[in-house]
Amino acid sequence: MRKVKPKLNLTSQTARIVNLSHDGRGIARVNGKATFIQGALPGEMVEFQYTRVKKDFDEGKLLSIIEPSTLRVEPKCPHYQMCGGCSLQHMSAEEQIRFKQSHLLDLLSRYGHTEPQSMLSPLTSHHWNYRNKARLSTRFVEKKQSTMVGFRERNNPRFITEINQCPILNSKIDTDIVHLRKLIDTMEDKQCIAQIEVAAGDNEVALIFRNLTPLTEQDELKIRKFAEQFQYKVFLQPGGLDSVFCFYPSDAHAYLSYELPDYQITFQFHPNDFTQVNAELNRKMVTQAIQLMELKNSDIVLDLFCGLGNFSLPMAKHCSRVIGVEGNKNMVERAYMNAKSNHITNVDFYAANLDDVMEVRNLVNTSFSKVLIDPPRSGALEIVKQIDSIDPERIVYVSCNPITLARDTDILVNQKGYVLITAGVMDMFPHTAHVESIALFQKG
């Protein structure tokens, strides 16, 4: 028998916000049931309207704030209420950090069944114009006869938020979004460009145009003029990821670069490569990871999910040898290229299935005193399950998902005999609910 959906009560309601959810929404208790309200802060009395009724929880739209929190600030971005690029601009920067640290500790306790012996001071950076990588959606709207360029709407991802600026994006893109819109407005095929990937190095910014159909000669000319006038490297992507090529300048090499000045290392990367979005925070993160490793000249270090060598190369300057293992062959090639260009010879890189520790052990037949793990959001479950085959004395775990960090912590601490010495948050994505963290485990 078909279930009847509960009817929404569209009359306005009032409630006191008692907490924040993991994604930064305010939580109210209405008739004993949790109601999630975007934009509300703990302690506030708010007026809201129900938008969804579920069995275990409800969702509501914030209508007004009757009693505001002292933690509330005015969002800097004029598009904040609609745009899905941010979710915490209404919260003070200091409170954002406290929220993320509390969330990390809660998950470590609830799912990791432990707590760190000490907490690291949070790593922070500039809160604005920090984001060096982003994917912007584009769409020409016939009714308006204009192009929309921006992030998806927060409450309706089918739609694009029409933005004129973005204070979290790299400052050059923040300024030039309007010009990007004008470019597509003038093209012969205004529906051709589906999205624009932004990738910024220390000195250059690249744009990858995802073109659904071949560009006309006139449109190619317009893109070249745009790139020349506003000083961009432009790449085109007519098909899959392997179809990306440098369109302008036609004689340019395909790489951008960023530096780790403390280690006198320069990394080259393709705009499609994975790199950290926040360059300032990345520099601080690398330094903190190396400090936590307490590297000695005799150490042989295993760097899992090593990417293009972001941790491997600076670590190599402080120990005997580093072995980096990565699942993506292209990134392994990039890591070798960066090692060579920086004259670092005590590193080796391998491509392997990182869900199969025995494959890694067969490739790398040596023992390791220390391991650095920097996995994707899915975490490092298979690695921590089989950590006995590596048996390091010290593990530094860099996480972009506190839920999988907590899960893996439970295994390391409660099954494998490690102690969670310290942990802390890294504010890689200010004004969002994303929690990046770092943790140190020592063999008990």
Curated annotation (Swiss-Prot):
<dbReference type="InterPro" id="IPR029063">
    <property type="entry name" value="SAM-dependent_MTases_sf"/>
</dbReference>
<feature type="domain" description="TRAM">
    <location>
        <begin position="5"/>
        <end position="64"/>
    </location>
</feature>
<dbReference type="GO" id="GO:0070041">
    <property type="term" value="F:rRNA (uridine-C5-)-methyltransferase activity"/>
</dbReference>
<keyword id="KW-0808">Transferase</keyword>
<dbReference type="Pfam" id="PF01938">
    <property type="entry name" value="TRAM"/>
</dbReference>
<feature type="binding site">
    <location>
        <position position="326"/>
    </location>
    <ligand>
        <name>S-adenosyl-L-methionine</name>
    </ligand>
</feature>
<dbReference type="GO" id="GO:0005506">
    <property type="term" value="F:iron ion binding"/>
</dbReference>
<feature type="active site" description="Nucleophile">
    <location>
        <position position="400"/>
    </location>
</feature>
<feature type="binding site">
    <location>
        <position position="166"/>
    </location>
    <ligand>
        <name>[4Fe-4S] cluster</name>
    </ligand>
</feature>
<dbReference type="GO" id="GO:0003723">
    <property type="term" value="F:RNA binding"/>
</dbReference>
<keyword id="KW-0949">S-adenosyl-L-methionine</keyword>
<feature type="binding site">
    <location>
        <position position="353"/>
    </location>
    <ligand>
        <name>S-adenosyl-L-methionine</name>
    </ligand>
</feature>
<dbReference type="GO" id="GO:0051539">
    <property type="term" value="F:4 iron, 4 sulfur cluster binding"/>
</dbReference>
<feature type="binding site">
    <location>
        <position position="276"/>
    </location>
    <ligand>
        <name>S-adenosyl-L-methionine</name>
    </ligand>
</feature>
<dbReference type="InterPro" id="IPR030390">
    <property type="entry name" value="MeTrfase_TrmA_AS"/>
</dbReference>
<feature type="binding site">
    <location>
        <position position="374"/>
    </location>
    <ligand>
        <name>S-adenosyl-L-methionine</name>
    </ligand>
</feature>
<feature type="binding site">
    <location>
        <position position="305"/>
    </location>
    <ligand>
        <name>S-adenosyl-L-methionine</name>
    </ligand>
</feature>
<dbReference type="InterPro" id="IPR002792">
    <property type="entry name" value="TRAM_dom"/>
</dbReference>
<feature type="binding site">
    <location>
        <position position="83"/>
    </location>
    <ligand>
        <name>[4Fe-4S] cluster</name>
    </ligand>
</feature>
<keyword id="KW-0004">4Fe-4S</keyword>
<dbReference type="InterPro" id="IPR030391">
    <property type="entry name" value="MeTrfase_TrmA_CS"/>
</dbReference>
<keyword id="KW-0698">rRNA processing</keyword>
<keyword id="KW-0408">Iron</keyword>
<dbReference type="InterPro" id="IPR010280">
    <property type="entry name" value="U5_MeTrfase_fam"/>
</dbReference>
<keyword id="KW-0479">Metal-binding</keyword>
<keyword id="KW-0411">Iron-sulfur</keyword>
<dbReference type="Pfam" id="PF05958">
    <property type="entry name" value="tRNA_U5-meth_tr"/>
</dbReference>
<feature type="binding site">
    <location>
        <position position="310"/>
    </location>
    <ligand>
        <name>S-adenosyl-L-methionine</name>
    </ligand>
</feature>
<dbReference type="InterPro" id="IPR001566">
    <property type="entry name" value="23S_rRNA_MeTrfase_RlmD"/>
</dbReference>
<comment type="function">
    <text>Catalyzes the formation of 5-methyl-uridine at position 1939 (m5U1939) in 23S rRNA.</text>
</comment>
<dbReference type="GO" id="GO:0070475">
    <property type="term" value="P:rRNA base methylation"/>
</dbReference>
<keyword id="KW-0489">Methyltransferase</keyword>
<comment type="similarity">
    <text>Belongs to the class I-like SAM-binding methyltransferase superfamily. RNA M5U methyltransferase family. RlmD subfamily.</text>
</comment>
<feature type="binding site">
    <location>
        <position position="77"/>
    </location>
    <ligand>
        <name>[4Fe-4S] cluster</name>
    </ligand>
</feature>
<feature type="binding site">
    <location>
        <position position="86"/>
    </location>
    <ligand>
        <name>[4Fe-4S] cluster</name>
    </ligand>
</feature>
<dbReference type="InterPro" id="IPR012340">
    <property type="entry name" value="NA-bd_OB-fold"/>
</dbReference>
<protein>
    <recommendedName>
        <fullName>23S rRNA (uracil(1939)-C(5))-methyltransferase RlmD</fullName>
        <ecNumber>2.1.1.190</ecNumber>
    </recommendedName>
</protein>
